[in-house]
Amino acid sequence: MQTEITAPVSIFDDVGRLCNFGWARGPFFHYDRELLWTPGRLITESERYIIFSPTHLFAFELYDAGALGHISICAVSLLDKAISRKFEKLSFPTGILKLPNQSEETIIKTAINDSLIEFICIEDGGRIIKIDAPQLSHNNRLRGEVVLMTQEDAQSIVTYAPWRRQTERFQLIRCSPWYTTEGVMQFENKPLLFNKGRAWGIYEWARIARPKKDIHYWAAACGMYKGQQIGFNVGYGSADSTAGTENAFFVNGVLHKLDQVTFKISPSNWLEPWHFTSNNNRLEMTFIPVQHNSYQNNFLFYSLRTRQFFGFFFGKITLDDGSLLHFNNITGITERRKTDN
């Protein structure tokens, strides 16, 4: 049985051991890096946003893994399938990105070489993203500002899980796949408008004390279908998800909890359709990739290999009240991330 946490708790007990594993509908788990026993080179802290309009998708990530890290910017044209990106490797970045302990305390301003990124948390759970990146691939420049707005009382999926037989390792992840987005991005020498009701955003926050090897699959999406805003977050990896899986579906900001979800990927061609099913037959979903982004980061004893795919989701979900919801053409992302220390 999964364990729902319904009030604020610490992830440590009185003597510093990990406790209170489970899942929550909000940021109830208190994380403090200063209390960790884990060596700094095994701690990962990251902040990630994916925003998209009917024509373009942009993904921004700040990633600090102790011995190495990166700043990643990816711009995808959903119409002609073109991609432009910037991947800035960071050696020993611990603390440089100044990522906060809590997801609701996000005020981050990062300037690396010629790029400037700002993530700002505002009142009512909204977010502001400011970007100025003049040297993306294909001589493209990306600059602009967008505001991510939330619905009143919108819920998030937050999971806190250990690794089996590794008492000091854990995975704490939050995903909010329901933002509406407004603003302008200047890309390919033309303005791209993000209009409320036609543009969306996904926020992911992660704090992880890693084992030596890990592999993690993830997918998330958001959009409007037949007058309802829907979104989801599904994923799994080598962490012990007995107390709470990452899998949840959202309708107008309300969370509907799922148990296990399986990713079915063609081993010969990852650009073929992906299929998703849940163990209790509540979810059946297909993903159609339109573009692929991959990168590898290696330094001394640590490596990170990531494969991302952007595209559209189709399927059906049985909600918590037993009603059946069909959805089509919802924009999102899938990913496989593998780490090795």
Where are these regions (language model features)?
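Structured soluble/peripheral alpha/beta segments that form catalytic or ligand/cofactor-binding pockets
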Residues: 1-341
